[in-house]
Design a protein with these regions (language model features):
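Bacterial Sec-dependent N-terminal signal peptides
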Residues: 1-49, 362
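N-terminal acidic, glycine/proline-rich low-complexity segments
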Residues: 34-362
Length: 362
């Protein structure tokens, strides 16, 4: 028989024990919260420390024929507003009279009127927007610092000036047209801008070249490769730093433009170019336009992952502009291989194309 005294003792013990358990649980909870806060703060500090520095980019575009160049330029400025890239220059490889005025008005719209612009002065292919009429539509609606492409300085001079001012091995060149300017840059001589010749200057200042060019592993004729075949051959054969190729097959299924037209800023030149062009060829653009140029810029700004993998080797061009690939694990060339679904890549790209500009005064 348990005595009354013993029962009272046990009851008191249990009450004390429960209080002790509660105190232990509460203490553990508070400690966990405190540790969690410390962990988050540490993570924030680490994130701040490892935050990527804006990638210095020279953007070389034909901005003629296909209007994906306009989409890529909108995307370029969106990435700059996000702090992911630093736009050093926007250069035309296309001497068509309306190209430089169009480049200028896009830069102005996005609040960057002072970005250097260059245009080729040597003979090369000239192409306007043909029956799509997006050049003249843009020029009629938006202010530009240029009336004609001839007013812009020589592309090679702009390249040499910009490169000479940058840290060594820092610049990424993104070309989304034919590569006449890059051939001419390699052939340029020492001058008052730099004591280095073109190839030496590229080797010293350029980290990599990302090109929308060719088709892989081989393609008979891709527009940018055949537009100036001699320039294509010379530039690729003599380029002293790594080259990444985004082939025709990468951009063709990355369809953009329809959401931009429906939901994009009504005053945007990027939206206007697509809104003017897509209805002109309803069968071709039923699901939007291919994002050939945008995929090149995406990789230049954000790297391969999670969008693409790549193959390493050597890009080989022929006299007629057809392209082939020689696999070589030690090669300096890479071409993109699809990894993320094209629709997912398209959504990310088109979101950038729909960007509303900040009031930047760079």
């Amino acid at each position: 028989v348990v005595s009354i005294k013993k029962i009272k003792y046990m009851r008191g013990y249990l009450l004390k024990s429960n209080k002790l358990v509660c105190l232990i649980i509460i203490s553990f909870f508070l400690l966990s919260c405190n540790n969690s806060g410390r962990s988050d703060n540490t993570a924030d500090k680490k994130t701040t420390k490892i935050q990527k520095k804006a990638i210095p980019i020279i953007f070389d575009t034909d901005l003629g024929g296909d209007f994906d160049d306009v989409g890529a330029m909108g995307m370029l400025h969106a990435l700059a507003d996000k702090g992911e890239v630093n736009i050093l220059a926007t250069i035309s490889c296309n001497p068509s009279p309306l190209v430089v005025p169009s480049i200028s008005l896009i830069n102005i719209y996005f609040g960057r009127p002072k970005i250097p612009i260059g245009s080729p002065k040597s003979p090369t292919r000239s192409q306007d927007s043909r029956e799509l009429h997006y050049h003249d539509s843009l020029i009629a609606h938006f202010p530009s610092a240029y009336k004609n492409s001839d007013e812009a300085p020589d592309a090679v001079v702009v390249y040499r000036k910009v490169l000479s001012q940058q840290p060594d091995s820092s610049v990424t060149i993104v070309s989304v047209g034919w590569v006449t300017n890059l051939r001419n840059l390699l052939l340029s001589k020492p001058d008052s801008i730099s004591p280095l010749d073109g190839k030496e200057l590229v080797a010293k200042k350029v980290k990599s070249w990302v090109a929308m060019l060719g088709g892989f592993p081989e393609r008979e004729k891709e527009a940018n490769a055949v537009s100036d075949t001699l320039a294509t051959q010379y530039a690729i054969d003599n380029w002293p730093t790594p080259i990444i190729f985004s082939g025709y097959e990468i951009g063709v299924d990355v369809k953009t433009g329809l959401r931009l037209i429906k939901e994009g800023p009504v005053d945007s030149p990027v939206r206007m170019a697509y809104a003017v062009s897509i209805p002109k060829r309803p069968k071709n653009y039923k699901y939007g336009n291919g994002s050939y140029d945008q995929t090149s810029l995406l990789v230049a700004a954000r790297g391969f992952e999670p969008y693409y993998s790549y193959k390493t080797g050597q890009f080989i061009t022929s006299d007629n502009g057809s392209t082939k690939w020689k696999y070589d694990p030690n090669g300096r060339h890479k071409y993109l291989v699809e990894k993320m679904a094209p629709d997912s890549v398209a959504f990310e790209i088109e979101t950038l194309m729909m960007h509303n500009p900040k009031n930047s005064t760079e």
